[in-house]
From Swiss-Prot:
Entry GO MF terms: GTP binding; GTPase activity; ribosomal small subunit binding; small ribosomal subunit rRNA binding
Gene this chain is encoded by: era
Domain Era-type G stretches: 3-171
Region (G5): 150-152
Organism of provenance: Clostridium tetani (strain Massachusetts / E88)
UniProt name for this protein: GTPase Era
């Protein structure tokens, strides 16, 4: 019996959704950073095994939006709930339920699909706090079909979670070819890798005002990639921070990004990144559409 279906991973920003998917796939497909709201599009990740095919939808963290980009991110997350077979609600061991989690759970109460509670980062918290968190969530929202404490970064209980997901999947066909692991284009993933390096290396006030626009991506006569990208920011002061003294920060971002892009593309890469100011781009519908936020 072959099973298949779609699974949404949903939760507050920065609870480890992308880390979980990257762990399951053993591929760097979703941007991972310690800063919240790093995932902006619902990346579809496809896991095909002998007895099943699971299509994971990695959503932006749900939150109350502050600008048009934020509204887009929340809309994408809400749309991801429609037409899926299982919802994985992910949180971290904080004891009491926070307002952000309650905001999401009140929406999940209304859906018919099975919802799993995934408590991540158990390796970073003591067992008492983990147990308290599990009890408080179960008591407040008894609709969870399964409750699984995990560590996505340390690979703890991830296999158990995977087996439980298979248990709830319906019989179905292979929706995608066996060798396909994502529906995202290479250009999108390359842009996300560059943005991830900026998120990791830059100070707190800059990253969420950053986007990466792919200008050109082509192979040269040697079969190596030549990539030109522009990093957009909202202020002149941010541009100076991104470039750094004598171009040192931009060089570091580009160097780290190139290393990961070469691993992803399995090819030598020549990467050039420029920085451009587009004031308040996160509230400009035209720019958002140009960058692919079309929801």
């Amino acid at each position: 019996m072959f099973k298949s279906g779609f699974i949404t991973v949903i939760g507050r920003p920065n609870v480890g959704k992308s880390t979980l998917l990257n762990n399951i796939m053993k591929e760097k497909l979703s941007i991972v950073s310690h800063k919240p709201q790093t995932t902006r599009n619902n990346i579809q990740t496809i896991l095909t095994q002998e007895d099943c095919q699971i299509v994971f939808v990695d959503t932006p963290g749900m939150h109350k939006p502050k600008h048009k980009l934020g509204e887009y991110m929340v809309k994408v997350a809400e749309e991801a709930l429609k037409g899926v077979d299982i919802v994985l609600f992910m949180t971290t061991p904080e004891g009491q339920l926070g307002r952000g989690d309650v905001y999401i759970l009140e929406q999940l109460k209304r859906i018919k699909q099975p919802v799993f509670l995934i408590v991540n980062k158990i390796d970073e918290n003591d067992q008492g706090k983990v147990a308290e968190t599990l009890k408080n969530y179960h008591d407040a929202y008894p609709f969870f079909k399964e409750i699984i404490p995990i560590s996505a970064s340390k690979d703890k209980n991830v296999d158990t979670l995977l087996e439980l997901m298979k248990k709830y999947l319906p019989e179905g066909p292979k929706y995608y070819p066996e060798d396909m692991i994502t529906d995202q284009q290479e250009r999108f993933i390359v842009a996300e890798i560059i943005r991830e390096k900026a998120l990791r290396l830059l100070s707190e006030e800059v990253p969420h005002g950053i986007a990466v626009e792919m200008m050109t991506m082509k192979k040269n006569e040697k079969g190596n990639y030549e990539i030109n990208a522009t990093m957009l920011c909202e202020r002149d002061s941010h541009k100076g921070i991104i470039i750094g003294k004598n171009g040192s920060m931009l060089k570091k971002i580009s160097q780290y990004a190139r290393q990961d892009i070469e691993k992803f593309l399995q090819s030598k890469v020549s990467l050039k990144v420029w920085v451009k100011v587009k004031k308040e781009w996160r509230d400009d519908n035209r720019i958002l559409k140009e960058l692919g936020y079309r929801q």
